[in-house]
Structures are given as structure tokens and as C-alpha cells.
Amino acid sequence: GNINIPKLGINYPILATTTEQTLKVAVTKYWGGNPNEVGNLCVSGHNYKNSKFFGKLLNIKNGDTIQISDLNGKTLNYKVYDTFIVDPQDTSCTSQLTNGKIEVTLITCTNGNKQRLILKAQEI
């Protein structure tokens, strides 16, 4: 799949697995189902100082649009509805309980890798 956040100039492929190596070259599927399916697709990416990958996520606001394309080329629009910061061991944001909705969660490090910035969005 692919993630596009026009407001931030973010446009990257989503790799299927999360490892130290894949996170160095792309954003990755951390947890959940396939792109644009019912459930909560969790995508992780590094927060590099040069704004690469998810380095600009702090600039996103509720109501902003994220686009996710699946492997069949279908693109869905998602509206950001929540952003918050958690400790690295808090994985509650990866819950698959979405009441039948299609959601995406973006995860990146913040505060010098001491915490995680979480961004939640739902299909519109």
C-alpha cells in the first residue's frame, strides 16, 4: 500500500513488516489488517530531524486528510480525529475494536524517542 498526506508532503509506500531495517527505508505496517479493510491499520515510521518519513506529523491537526492506497490501487480518504502522546509500552492504540469502521493509526517517536506520538484517523 501507500500513504499520502498532501498537507505535509508525505507520500511513501507502506512496507508489510516492521523491522529495524525496514524502518530505515520506509514507513511500515506495525499491526492490523490490510490497507482499506475494516479494522485498525497501524503504520509506524521514524521521526527524522530532516522531516523524512513521519518527521512532520506533529504539524497535523484534527480534520486533516490522510489517503491510503491498497495493493489493488484503491485509495480511501481518512479524516484525523485524535492525536495524543503515550509511553512506548502503551499499545492500546493498536486495538482492532473499531465497531466495523475502517481506521488507520500512525505511530512515530517523539520527545527524543522517550514517547510515541499517535495519530488516529477514520475513513470518510
Task: Annotate each predicted stretch with a short phrase.
Residues 1-124:
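Solvent-exposed, non-transmembrane regions of membrane-associated and secreted proteins
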